[in-house]
Each structure stands twice: as structure tokens, then as C-alpha cells.
């Protein structure tokens, strides 16, 4: 499962360059943002907590984008070695760990042999719930698999997750009440929140609480390269010690992103080895990992206190915003503009770019552990997979468990599999919100710009009837944008779409759909903002309807806003494992 997702970004970059050369003024797009401030750089001899936490995440390759946010939201690793089964070591033939840090979730699948006997297990934790599965995703689809609740295993599994090579610095930042070290105060000293720093034998030692495990305290000792060589967690009468070494980028050679992970890992409980692993491969680029909790597990588990929310940076917490310039402030006291028939008038130009991308301001500088041939421009392309908005948020579509690996595989081969890379439209709802709207009493027209969802796609348009007509059951034509009809529910415009083809994705990350997809979009204008809500149903591939994170479109007063260049031609070239497209 490996593919250089960044390779396709070269084509996307061409599109951006061409778009920048299109005959649009800066004011037409709301103006460009000011240059980013110089990045925080600790002094070489800095020994305060801010410097140590920053160096920890920086040296591990966890900082992404020109703003250097910590953006490792999910990962997988595979390994070999031994695990303890019934108190005795068992030689692994399979070990696969899938982690979602945003939801405090981890699924570990292993198979091992001892004395001619095969053992296997699927161990899962998600927030305050723990269980074992007989098949991956047991009970998420009714009648498929068996989930066995194990409430007594929650604490040990959360400790393993948050003491892991990437989990430990995240937990330390969580304890410091700041998800980005470079945002800590300069005078923080050796303490911030519940996270403390000491120096022992010339090495930084960071102490922090384990999220979700009251009373559990971790002590991480970092080496000269600011990577954890040991993390010791004390919780009641149990001491769990994790030893790490041989840090490297273990991703496939086709998708090196220079995020480091430990190659050697040993776990001991009260001095006894329980797991000894050698990493064979990682996938650190925000891979699709979901850990939904079966209803039977929730019913069997008593949760006495709310589980702590894992802090996320503002980029992740804010699901909408203008890419270019500052959005207009909502005129809350201004009367609602209405048409002659009394409907809210949505005619106008709208800042509809959604997301915060590294190429807003420029390229990320090379980090201290990156290869000698690193360039900021190269970082821009590798960071793309971390910053594409549909890939880093916790609100991902929940696919049927048997399709989870397919989503990952499509993601790995995005540049060949993503339909937009072969010149096809983004489709609905991936196209995002419209840049310009024309409204009449009978229909509404949307004009879309290009570059949505991290740089892909072309300008497109939709003309949608809003006269309460129903879908034509005789129209069997499938379309990229579907067959859409609209009606008003009070002051909300509701668009109902069916009749899609299966040649678009819901977003970057392999989020495919079937031709049975049904999409409902809602547009509600208040002042000079439009709330854009989307619900996607696709029982062929999804476990449940996907309710997309609401977005806001903000009015742009410039008369040139919403102008888009003509949809260009597109040519596709096959380059071994890379599909390259040139727009002109």
C-alpha cells in the first residue's frame, strides 16, 4: 500500500499557476493574505519547555505547512517480533496498528505462532471504550462479526496509544494546553499546564498526563535528536515502560514524507516484556483510520466522566474560511435581502474557498532531520497530503468495514485513481460552495471556481430548478453533478440530487461513492453569510449518512468577485505509476 500522493500535486500546482495567470484581479478574489511571520526557531542552547516541545515535534517531522502546525492526525505501522500470549512470547506473523489521534482510537491486529499453534486478536480502543473483534469493524454493520466489550482494558490501551512515538509528544502538548509548541508563550519556562520539563544527565525529560487515564503520568526521556528513547508511565501499581530506537521514515519508497517513527519498540509492564517489535513499514500521511464504537460496547461500558477532548489547532477546528483575504463581517442588523416573491435573495458573489493550505503563503523550510536534498518547494508537495481539507478532519465518511482497505488503497494511488486527476469534474459535494449565484423565481445558477479541496478541479456551473418539481423517474442519465431539483423550506433553499455517476469522489483521501448516492444540500442566508450544509446517503458503501461539517459562504462586495476563467483543455499522460495532467 504505497504511492507518492505528492506526485499528482505537481499537476495541481500547474493548475494553480495557470489560475494565478488568469485575467482576474486580486480584488476579484478578495485580495491575497499578508506574508507569514518568520517561523519560530529555538536558540541552539535553548532549554525551556517551549523549545524542547517544538524540537521534539520538529525533529520527528510532525510539523507541516508554512505555519508549521502539528498535523499528524492518523497513521498505521506494521511490524514483526513477539507479543505475550498467556504470559509467554508468541512469534508474530502479522502486526498492524491503525491509530487515529483525533478520536483517541487504535486498532491492533496481530497473528502469531507458538509451539505450532496460531493465535490471533484484534484489540481496539476508542476514547473510553475498549473491546476485541473477531473481524475488523465487528458489529458496525448489523449481523457482521462479534465485538467483546473489555472495559478493564481501556487504560492500558490508551497508555500504549499516548506513549507511542508520535502519541507522546501529542500528549505532552495536550498537557500543556496548546496543540502547537510554537504558540506557547516565550516566557513559559519549564512548565505549562500539566506538562513539566527537567534536565537529567544532559537530556530533556518531559513529564505529562496520559489523556483519558486519570492519575497516569508519563515521563519521556529524549535523546540528542529530541526523539523519545524511553517513555515510562506510572498508573497506580502498574509501571509501563516503552523503549524506542532506530528512528526513520519507514514509509514505502514511493511515499517518503520524512515523518519519523521508531524502528525498534519494546514494551514492559512491571519489568516484564509484553511486546517487542521491529517496524517494517509505516503510512504516516493522514491515512484513513476510523474506530467506530459498536452499540453493544457502549451499552456494556459505564462511562463515569466525560472523555477529554483532544485539542486541535485552529486550522482543524475551523471547518470553513476564505482562502484569499479576509471574509466580510456579517451584517447582523442588516435586513435580509429578499426577492420579489419574498424568498431570501442569494444572488451575488461569495468567498467560497474552504480550507487552509500550505501554498497560501509559500513553502515550508527544511527541518533538521530531513534529507540533504530537501527543498522548501519539495516540502510544499509532500505537505499537500497533510493539509488537503478533506483528509485531516475528524469528520470523515464512515465506510463499511470491508471497504476500509479499499479507501486506503485508493488514497495511496490518488494520482491514478482520483477522477479529478484524469480531467473529470469534482462533482457534488466536493466542488464546494459557489463563487457566484444568480437567482430567479424558477431556478438558481451556481458558478464554481477551481482549486477546491486542495487544488484540484475546474470552474463548473449548475442550473437548478427551484419550482418544487420532483425528480423525473424516466430520466436514467447519470451525471457528475447528479440530477438536482430544489424547493424552499421557509428561508432555506433545499437541493435534492440523485442520478450520479460513480466517477467522482467526496474528497481527497479515496472517499469514493457509488451511483446510488443521494445528496441533500441546504443553503440558509443570514445577513451576508450563507450557511452551507450537506448530507450524503449512499447505502451501497456507507454505514450511515455522512453529514458534512457545515461551511459558510461570505459575501464579497467586489463586482469582479466570482469571475472564473474558461474551463481549459486537459491532457493526461501516463508515467509508470504516475498520472500527470497538464492544463492549458
Give the predicted meaning of each segment:
Residues 9-22:
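Bacterial N-terminal signal peptides
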Residues 20-31:
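Signal peptide processing junction and immediate N-terminal pro/mature segment
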Residues 30-58, 62-75, 80-190, 194, ...:
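PEST-like low-complexity, intrinsically disordered acidic/proline/serine-rich tracts
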Amino acid at each position: 500500500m504505497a504511492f507518492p500522493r505528492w506526485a499528482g500535486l505537481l499537476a495541481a500546482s500547474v493548475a494553480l499557476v495557470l489560475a494565478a495567470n488568469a485575467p482576474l484581479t486580486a480584488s476579484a478574489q478578495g485580495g491575497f493574505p499578508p506574508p507569514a511571520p518568520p517561523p519560530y526557531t529555538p536558540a541552539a542552547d535553548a532549554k525551556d519547555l517551549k523549545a524542547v516541545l517544538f524540537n521534539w515535534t520538529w525533529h520527528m517531522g510532525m510539523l507541516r505547512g508554512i505555519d508549521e502546525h502539528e498535523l499528524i492526525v492518523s497513521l498505521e505501522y506494521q511490524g514483526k517480533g513477539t507479543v505475550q500470549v498467556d504470559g509467554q512470547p508468541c512469534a508474530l506473523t502479522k502486526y498492524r496498528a491503525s491509530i487515529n489521534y483525533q478520536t483517541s482510537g487504535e486498532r491492533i491486529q496481530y497473528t502469531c505462532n507458538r509451539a505450532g499453534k496460531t493465535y490471533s486478536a484484534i484489540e481496539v480502543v476508542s476514547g473510553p471504550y475498549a473491546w476485541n473483534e473477531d473481524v475488523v469493524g465487528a458489529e458496525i454493520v448489523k449481523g457482521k462479526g462479534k465485538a467483546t466489550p473489555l472495559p478493564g482494558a481501556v487504560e492500558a490501551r490508551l497508555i500504549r496509544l499516548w506513549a507511542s512515538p508520535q502519541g507522546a509528544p501529542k500528549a505532552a502538548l495536550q498537557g500543556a494546553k496548546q496543540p502547537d509548541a510554537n504558540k506557547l508563550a516565550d516566557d513559559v519556562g519549564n512548565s505549562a499546564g500539566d506538562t513539566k520539563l527537567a534536565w537529567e544527565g544532559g537530556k530533556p525529560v518531559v513529564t505529562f498526563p496520559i489523556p483519558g487515564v486519570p492519575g497516569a503520568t508519563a515521563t519521556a526521556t529524549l535523546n540528542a535528536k529530541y526523539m523519545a528513547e524511553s517513555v515510562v508511565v506510572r498508573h497506580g501499581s502498574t509501571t509501563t515502560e516503552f523503549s524506542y530506537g532506530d528512528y526513520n521514515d519507514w514509509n514505502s519508497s514511493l511515499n517518503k514524507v520524512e515523518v519519523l517513527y521508531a524502528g525498534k519498540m519494546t514494551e514492559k509492564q512491571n519489568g516484564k516484556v509484553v511486546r517487542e517489535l521491529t517496524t517494517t513499514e509505516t503510512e504516516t500521511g493522514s491515512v484513513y483510520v476510523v474506530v467506530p464504537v459498536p452499540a453493544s460496547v457502549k451499552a456494556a461500558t459505564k462511562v463515569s466522566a466525560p472523555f477529554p477532548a483532544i485539542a486541535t489547532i485552529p486550522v482543524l477546528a475551523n471547518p470553513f474560511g476564505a482562502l484569499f483575504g479576509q471574509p466580510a463581517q456579517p451584517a447582523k442588523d442588516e435586513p435580509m435581502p429578499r426577492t420579489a416573491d419574498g424568498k431570501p435573495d442569494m444572488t451575488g458573489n461569495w468567498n467560497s474557498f474552504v480550507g487552509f493550505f500550505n501554498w497560501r503563503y509559500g513553502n515550508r523550510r527544511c527541518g533538521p532531520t530531513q534529507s540533504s536534498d530537501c527543498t522548501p518547494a519539495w516540502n510544499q508537495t509532500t505537505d499537500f497530503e497533510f493539509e488537503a481539507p478533506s483528509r485531516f478532519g475528524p469528520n470523515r465518511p464512515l465506510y463499511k468495514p470491508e471497504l476500509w482497505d479499499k479507501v486506503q488503497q485508493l488514497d495511496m494511488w490518488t494520482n491514478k485513481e482520483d477522477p479529478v486527476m484524469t480531467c473529470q469534474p469534482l462533482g457534488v459535494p466536493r466542488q464546494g460552495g459557489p463563487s457566484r449565484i444568480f437567482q430567479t423565481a424558477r431556478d438558481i445558477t451556481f458558478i464554481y471556481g477551481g482549486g477546491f479541496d486542495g487544488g484540484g478541479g475546474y470552474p463548473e456551473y449548475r442550473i437548478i430548478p427551484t419550482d418544487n418539481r420532483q425528480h423525473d423517474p424516466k430520466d436514467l442519465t447519470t451525471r457528475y453533478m447528479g440530477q438536482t431539483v430544489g424547493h424552499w423550506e421557509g428561508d432555506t433553499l433545499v437541493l435534492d440530487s440523485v442520478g450520479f455517476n460513480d466517477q467522482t469522489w467526496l474528497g481527497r483521501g479515496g472517499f469514493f461513492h457509488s451511483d446510488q448516492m443521494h445528496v441533500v444540500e441546504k443553503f440558509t442566508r443570514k445577513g451576508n453569510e450563507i450557511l452551507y450544509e450537506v448530507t450524503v446517503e449512499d447505502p451501497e458503501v456507507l454505514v450511515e449518512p455522512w453529514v458534512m461539517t457545515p461551511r459558510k459562504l461570505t459575501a464579497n462586495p467586489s463586482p469582479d468577485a466570482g469571475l472564473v476563467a474558461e474551463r481549459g483543455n486537459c491532457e493526461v499522460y501516463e508515467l509508470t505509476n504516475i498520472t500527470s495532467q497538464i492544463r492549458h
